[in-house]
A protein has these predicted regions:
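Glycine- and Gly-Pro-enriched alpha-helical subdomains that act as flexible
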Residues: 239-260
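Secondary-structure junction motif
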Residues: 269-271
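N-terminal amphipathic/basic-hydrophobic helices that include classical n-h-c signal peptides
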Residues: 1-35
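Conserved alpha/beta cores of soluble small-molecule-handling proteins
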Residues: 26, 30-232, 236-239, 265, ...
Length: 346
């Protein structure tokens, strides 16, 4: 393959490597050298773009029972999370002094920790107490984003074996004043299909919300190098799956499509959107579908705890619909979800 007098040799280790993966590899390889369309010559964005808030420079952070100023919050260089990415985390939103969908987030956290034999060292009530204490120390009650992180703890030697983690878990809670930037609701996110895929469960199950995010970081880097904001990741069979940070939906002929869920993160917001569609007579399907079908969607959006529903304006430079991914179905879902959050945190 030749482009701009450069020769790229692509080596595929398996005959099962699908055409969709080849398309993704070509997008990431050559989009850096292609002329960027006018509608893509804008600064890079993220689904986690938030309004700047000076108060976040002075937050207090929970570290193993202590609540300390931001610049004093530290964990050991021997910590399992730092050394190996051995830990789980949850992202949650605080509205009106209540955590949105707290039980669902705890279900995911405790199930994940149980699956990897990580003893949290406290029950749900204990976690809620720690969250409440951290929020109170920061005088926070609304439009707050929390990252709750739990690792296997400090090791006695810098090696992999879990038996070397003998101190008990490390628990960190970071809360920030964090209101999503409204500009993305108008402009939408730009996606690029990337070579990096969400793997099979026998490698590392994508349902784990783990500290080991290198796979997704690589996907994000590939997307940025292709001139996009986030990477659209395929599953091992070449079907559209998820992005590096969020779950992915399209709308075709009034129907909502998302992946089967076999290879994507077990998203709380994703499931809420599916449930809302079913409860409000919006046709919704968890199914395999191709890039061909994604390119031809009338609407597309991402779901996540922080951004709720973020429209997708382009995929691989191709405009989605006539309004940067927005449309009547996604607007209705956004309102239904906002109403559900308000009800859950009333």
């Amino acid at each position: 393959l030749e482009a701009n007098n450069e020769v790229a040799i692509l080596v595929f280790p398996s005959k099962r490597f699908k055409l969709a993966h080849l398309i993704a590899a070509l997008n990431a390889r050559f989009n850096m050298n292609a002329k960027v369309p006018d509608h893509m010559t804008v600064p890079s964005h993220s689904t986690h773009d938030a309004l700047e808030d000076e108060r976040n420079q002075h937050i207090k952070i929970y570290v193993n029972g202590d609540i300390v100023p931001r610049d004093q919050a530290k964990v050991s260089v021997y910590d399992s999370g730092f050394m190996l990415g051995d830990g789980m985390w949850e992202g949650m939103r605080l509205y009106n002094g209540k955590w949105a969908f707290f039980d669902e987030h705890m279900d995911r956290l405790f199930n994940s920790c149980k699956a990897v034999s990580l003893d949290i060292g406290m029950d749900r009530a204990g976690i809620l107490t720690a969250l409440s204490a951290t929020a109170a120390a920061n005088d926070m009650s609304h439009d707050v984003h929390c990252r709750l992180m739990i690792t296997r703890g400090t090791k006695v030697k810098p090696f992999q074996h879990p038996v070397l983690s003998q101190s008990g878990p490390t628990i960190v809670i970071i809360m920030e004043h964090s209101k999503p930037a409204t500009s993305l609701q108008a402009s939408g996110i730009r996606l690029a299909t990337v070579p990096q895929v969400r793997g099979l469960p026998m490698s590392q199950d994508a349902k784990f919300n783990s500290h080991s995010k290198l796979n997704c970081v690589i996907a994000c880097l590939q997307a940025e190098q292709a001139g996009a904001d986030e990477g659209l990741m395929l599953d091992p069979h070449g079907f559209v799956n998820t992005t590096n940070a969020c779950n992915f939906f399209i709308v075709r002929n009034g129907e909502v499509w998302t992946s089967t869920g076999d290879y994507c993160m077990n998203g709380v917001t994703r499931q809420k959107v599916i449930d809302l569609c079913r409860a409000n007579d919006i046709p919704v399907h968890e199914k395999n579908y191709s890039l061909y079908e994604a390119y031809g969607a009338e609407e597309a959006f991402l779901t996540g705890t922080f951004g709720a529903q973020t429209p997708v304006a382009t995929i691989d430079g191709k405009r989605i619909g006539d309004h940067d991914g927005l449309g009547p179905v996604s607007r209705r879902i956004r309102q239904l979800y906002a109403d559900l959050v308000a009800e859950n945190t009333a």
